[in-house]
């Protein structure tokens, strides 16, 4: 079964972008390539329970098991050894990516307290968008009673767009609630 946003993209958004930007064919239309959810855990090297619970939360949110990110080199000031776990990350592609984007736009972001929209200036110059969330409670999959600590996460939406304006257009068409 194909995801709702994937069908919306193929049937409504892509033709609209072809007409608006005067692309010669449908393959020139920028698409969302992947979504990367990352959570850095500074104190995870001392406590494996934090690491495990964070990995389970990201698995619930993304619908796919994450991987541990490890330190590349030792830093004595942070009591950090080389190759110790420092975070977790999940890369979503295909149907799972569209399912997560749908839940993010329609369920999670509206549940943020005092939500006014997300910052339209968080593009990287190549059409990719990054967004930081301060807590995981906005996702309906997370049970408030089962979390041990409120932790945030970084979400990067990587597109095939060449410019920020193209990336903005595609995310706006998907319904991303940008600030005016």
From Swiss-Prot:
Q: Does the keyword Chloroplast apply?
A: yes
Q: Cross-referenced Pfam families, in alphabetical order?
A: Ribosomal_L5, Ribosomal_L5_C
Q: Which GO terms describe its molecular function?
A: rRNA binding; structural constituent of ribosome
Q: Which PROSITE patterns match?
A: RIBOSOMAL_L5
What is an annotated GO biological process for this record, any one? translation
Which keywords appear in this protein's UniProt record, sorted alphabetically?
Chloroplast, Plastid, Ribonucleoprotein, Ribosomal protein, RNA-binding, rRNA-binding
Q: Which GO terms describe its cellular component?
A: chloroplast; ribonucleoprotein complex; ribosome
Cellular location(s) = Plastid, Chloroplast
Per the UniProt entry, the signal peptide is none
Principal location: plastid
The lineage's top-level taxon is: Eukaryota
Subunit note: Part of the 50S ribosomal subunit; contacts the 5S rRNA.
Report the function annotation for this chain: Binds 5S rRNA, forms part of the central protuberance of the 50S subunit.
Protein family per UniProt:
Belongs to the universal ribosomal protein uL5 family.
Q: Which NCBIfam families match?
A: PRK00010.1
**HAMAP family named in the record:** Ribosomal_uL5_B (MF_01333_B)
Q: What is this protein's record name?
A: Large ribosomal subunit protein uL5c
User: What's the source species' lineage?
Assistant: Eukaryota, Viridiplantae, Chlorophyta, Ulvophyceae, OUU clade
Which gene carries the instructions for this protein?
A: rpl5
């Amino acid at each position: 079964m194909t995801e709702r946003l994937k069908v919306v993209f193929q049937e409504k958004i892509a033709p609209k972008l072809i007409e608006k930007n005067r692309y010669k064919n449908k393959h020139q239309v920028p698409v969302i390539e992947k979504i990367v959810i990352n959570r850095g855990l500074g104190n995870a090297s001392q406590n494996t329970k934090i690491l495990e619970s964070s990995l389970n939360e990201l698995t619930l949110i993304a619908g796919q098991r994450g991987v541990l990110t490890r330190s590349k080199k030792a830093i004595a000031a942070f009591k950090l050894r080389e190759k110790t776990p420092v975070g977790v990350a999940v890369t979503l592609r295909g149907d799972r990516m569209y399912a997560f984007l749908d839940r993010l736009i329609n369920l999670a972001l509206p549940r943020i307290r005092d939500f006014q929209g997300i910052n339209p200036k968080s593009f990287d110059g190549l059409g990719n968008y990054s967004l930081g969330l301060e807590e995981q409670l906005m996702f309906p999959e997370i049970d408030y009673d089962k979390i041990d600590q409120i932790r945030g996460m970084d979400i990067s939406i990587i597109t095939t767009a060449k410019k920020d304006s193209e990336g903005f257009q595609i995310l706006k068409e998907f319904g991303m609630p940008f600030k005016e």
